[in-house]
A protein has these predicted regions:
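Active-site beta->alpha loop and helix N-cap motifs at the rims of alpha/beta catalytic domains
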Residues: 2-158, 165
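Catalytic alpha/beta core domains of metabolic enzymes, predominantly
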Residues: 115-222
Length: 222
């Protein structure tokens, strides 16, 4: 019994350690359904704010500002293929800094087939130098343990190598945040592959939170 208690305590401690630093994600539409984030989340909880196709970027700014005012750490998405040009990106980053003190963003390609403007991928966003201009020195980039329907495995590997090189060269603290994953072996095998290929960026695993079967099925199709 004593041994079992020790093992159970160790397991609980491991779970608690693994759960530290977690974040959640919210859409502007989802945020509108929440009266006060401070009533359901601990202070300084990291909340990623999505930038979905067809969404007004200023809607993301508004949610980011609200989260900041309610005591959260807001991390807005930057969807490369949904941005018009560097001027729009510059203005958006300026708004995030001025309205919510943002010092971290999550950069993704974005779920559209045809870019609306000058950017096609997240690396192009990084290469503008605008993050550094606005004092944003920490950023997440997408990880794809299950691959991507939009990008070949070779292109994904090349992009990850470029992001590792960028982080070393520019001093920006990049990390990988993966797509939603349901099977641990897939994630673990992917991590071994990218590490063997030279990845040194920290990895945050995306998992779905409590949801209905219908919602989980929709996540699985993303």
């Amino acid at each position: 019994m004593g041994k079992m208690r020790i093992d159970m305590t160790a397991n609980i401690q491991q779970i608690q350690q693994a759960a530290q630093g977690w974040s959640i994600e919210v859409t502007p539409a989802g945020a509108a359904k929440i009266d006060n984030f401070a009533a359901c989340l601990a202070p300084e909880t990291t909340v990623n704010v999505t930038f979905l196709p067809g969404t007004d970027p200023m809607a993301t700014v508004a949610v980011t500002k609200r989260l900041h005012n309610e005591g959260m750490k807001a991390v807005p998405h930057l969807a490369a293929r949904s941005l018009k040009d560097a001027d729009q990106l510059d203005g958006l980053l300026a708004a995030y800094r001025a309205e919510a003190g943002v010092d971290e963003v999550l950069i993704i390609g974005g779920g559209v087939d045809n870019p609306v403007g000058a950017f096609d991928n997240s690396m192009q966003i990084l290469e503008t130098g605008l993050l550094q201009k606005h004092g944003i020195m920490r950023a997440g980039v997408a990880g794809h343990p299950e691959g991507s329907p939009d990008i070949s495995d070779i292109e994904i590997a090349d992009a990850l190598a470029a992001k590792n090189a960028f982080a070393k060269r520019e001093g920006v603290k990049l990390y990988i945040e993966t797509q939603f994953c349901f099977e641990a072996p897939i994630v673990l095998n992917w991590e071994k592959r990218v590490r063997a290929a030279g990845n040194e960026l920290p990895i945050r695993i995306g998992i779905p939170g409590p949801a209905t079967i219908k919602t989980l099925f929709r996540f699985a199709q993303i």
